[in-house]
A protein has these predicted regions:
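Beta1/beta-strand and adjacent pyrophosphate-binding region of the FAD-binding site
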Residues: 1-13
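Glycine-rich FAD pyrophosphate-binding loop
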Residues: 22-45
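Active-site-adjacent segment of FAD-dependent monooxygenases/related oxidoreductases
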Residues: 40-116
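Conserved FAD-binding catalytic core of PHBH/FMO-like flavoproteins
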Residues: 115, 129-133, 138-277, 281-289
C-alpha cells in the first residue's frame, strides 16, 4: 500500500512541495489552518514582500512557475539608500549592474503556488484545519475546524507550517531533540506608499533603505505602483509613539522624504501589527515514530530573519532537495529524508548567520564611507577577475552555490585580495624608496658639481 502523505501548511513551501510530490505520482493531503486565501484575502499588515532570486527561481522552474512568477514581480537592480537629509544614493547589487532580485507579493506568489498544487493530480487541500495534535505512535492528526474536531492519519507528515510549527510541538520534548529560538530586540511593522498620480512615488528599480544606525526602514515596489514599506524598530521605539502627532513628528525628523508619501502613516503605524524577528534552529529535522515519520521543512526547521531576502528561497531549496533525494533513493522515504536533513542543515545554519550579519550592514554599515569604498573595491575586483572574485551578496542571491560553502569562499578571496593589496603596497613603497634614493643621489651629484665649478 502506498504511503499516506500529509503536508501541514499551505504556504509557499507546502504548496511547492505538494506539487513536486504529485508530479512523482504521490497522493498528498495538505492541511492549512487559515481559510482559503483566495476567498478570505490577506491579513492586514502581514505581507512583507519577498525578494525572489536565483535559488527560488530555480525551484519555481521545477514546477513550471518561473516565468509566471517573474511576470508578477518587479526587478530591483540595487539598493537606493536614503539619507536623513533626504538625499539618495543608488548602490548596484552586482559589478555590471545587470543582476536583480525580484520583488513579489507573498500573497501573489502563494496564490500561484496554491492554484498550481490544486491543479496537480493527487493533491487534496483542506482549509480551516488547525492542527492540535500529532500522535507519532499512531500517525493520527487531530484538527480543529469550524465544523468541530476532525481526525486524519498519515504515514509521512511533512511540517511546512512555519516558525511556530504546530507539528514540531509533537517532538519538542523528545529526548535528543535540540531547539533554540533567538529573538532580535527589533520587530517589524508594515506601511504603504500608494501610487502618486498613477505612477511610482519612488524609483521602482531599487530596494529602498533608510538606514538609521539602530533601526531602519525598507520599501519594495509592487505591480500596482505602490510600495510596501517595513519598519525594523525596537519594541521600545514602537511603544514610544502613541499619538498621530508623535508619529508624524518622529518621521519628519528621521524619515523626512516619506512623510508626504504615506497618507495613512499614523493609522497604519497605530493599527498594523508588530511582527517578531527570530532565528530558530533545531535538530534533528526527521523523527520516526511507531505510527508515522515527521520531517520539518522550511521555517519549521530553520526560521531566519529576512535581511538577506532568503527565507522563501531557502525553503524552496528544501523542497527541491526532498524531491532530489526521493529520486536518488527510488522513493524510499526513510533514506530520502535522512539524506535531506544531512545535506540541508549546514546550509541553513550558514544563511541564518549571514542574514543576521546583513541586518547590521543594512541598518548601519551601509552608511559608512569605509563600507562604500570596500564595496567599490569588490566590484572593481569582480570586473577585473570575473568568476574568480565574487561578492558574498552575489554568491547568495545570484548563484545556487550551497550557502555553507560561501563563508569559506569569502575567507579565501579576502586572503587573496589582502595579499594582493600588500604586494601592491610593498611595490609602491619600493618604488617610492628607489625614487627617494635616486633623488638624493642626484642632489649629491649636483652639489658636488657645483663645488667643482666654484
Amino acid at each position: 500500500m502506498a504511503d499516506r502523505v500529509a503536508i501541514v501548511g499551505a504556504g509557499l513551501a507546502g504548496c511547492l512541495l505538494a506539487t513536486l510530490l504529485a508530479r512523482r505520482g504521490i497522493e498528498v493531503t495538505v492541511y492549512e489552518r487559515r481559510d482559503d486565501p483566495r476567498v478570505a484575502g490577506p491579513e492586514r499588515g502581514r505581507s512583507i514582500n519577498l525578494a525572489i532570486s536565483a535559488r527560488g527561481l530555480q525551484a519555481l522552474d521545477q514546477v513550471g512557475l518561473r516565468e509566471l512568477s517573474l511576470s508578477r514581480a518587479l526587478p530591483m537592480h540595487g539598493r537606493m539608500v536614503h539619507a536623513p537629509t533626504g538625499g539618495q544614493s543608488f548602490r548596484p547589487y552586482s559589478a555590471d549592474g545587470a543582476h536583480a532580485i525580484n520583488s513579489i507579493s507573498r500573497t501573489e506568489l502563494n496564490m500561484a503556488l496554491l492554484e498550481d498544487s490544486e491543479r496537480a493530480r493527487g493533491v487534496c487541500l483542506r482549509f480551516a484545519h488547525r492542527l492540535r495534535e500529532l500522535d507519532m505512535t499512531t500517525g493520527e492528526l487531530w484538527f480543529e475546524t469550524p465544523d468541530g474536531p476532525r481526525q486524519a492519519a498519515a504515514d509521512i507528515v511533512l511540517a511546512c507550517d512555519g516558525a511556530y510549527s504546530a507539528a514540531r510541538r509533537s517532538v519538542t520534548f523528545q529526548m535528543g531533540f535540540t531547539f533554540s529560538q533567538d529573538y532580535l530586540e527589533h520587530g517589524s511593522k508594515e506601511l504603504a506608499i500608494p501610487p502618486r498620480n498613477g505612477q511610482f512615488a519612488l524609483d521602482p528599480d531599487a530596494l529602498h533603505i533608510w538606514p538609521r544606525g539602530a533601526e531602519m526602514m525598507i520599501a519594495l515596489p509592487n505591480l500596482d505602483r505602490s510600495f510596501t514599506c517595513t519598519l525594523f524598530w525596537t519594541g521600545e521605539a514602537f511603544a514610544a509613539l502613541r499619538t498621530p502627532a508623535e508619529i508624524v513628528a518622529r518621521f519628519r525628523e528621521d524619515y523626512p522624504d516619506v512623510v508626504d508619501l504615506i497618507p495613512e502613516l499614523a493609522d497604519d503605524h497605530l493599527h498594523n501589527p508588530i511582527g517578531s524577528l527570530a532565528t530558530i534552529r533545531c535538530w534533528p529535522w526527521v523523527h520516526h515514530g511507531a505510527g508515522c515519520t515527521l520531517a520539518l521543512v522550511g521555517d519549521a526547521a530553520h526560521a531566519i530573519v529576512p535581511f538577506f531576502g532568503q527565507g522563501a528561497n531557502c525553503a524552496f531549496e528544501d523542497c527541491v532537495e526532498i524531491d532530489h533525494c526521493l529520486d536518488e533513493t527510488a522513493g524510499d522515504w526513510t533514506a530520502a529524508l535522512a539524506a535531506y536533513q544531512q545535506r540541508r542543515k549546514a546550509n541553513c545554519d550558514a544563511i541564518a548567520d549571514m542574514a543576521l550579519d546583513n541586518f547590521t550592514e543594512m541598518r548601519d554599515r551601509v552608511n559608512s564611507p569605509v563600507f562604500r569604498a570596500s564595496t567599490a573595491a569588490r566590484h572593481f575586483l569582480e570586473r577585473r577577475l570575473p568568476g574568480r572574485y565574487v561578492s558574498r551578496y552575489e554568491l547568495v542571491s545570484f548563484t545556487t552555490m550551497p550557502y555553507a560553502q560561501i563563508p569559506a569562499r569569502m575567507r579565501r578571496q579576502d586572503r587573496a585580495t589582502a595579499l594582493a593589496a600588500a604586494g601592491l603596497t610593498g611595490a609602491a613603497g619600493l618604488l617610492a624608496a628607489v625614487f627617494r634614493a635616486g633623488a638624493r643621489h642626484g642632489a649629491a651629484r649636483r652639489g658636488a658639481a657645483a663645488g667643482t665649478d666654484q
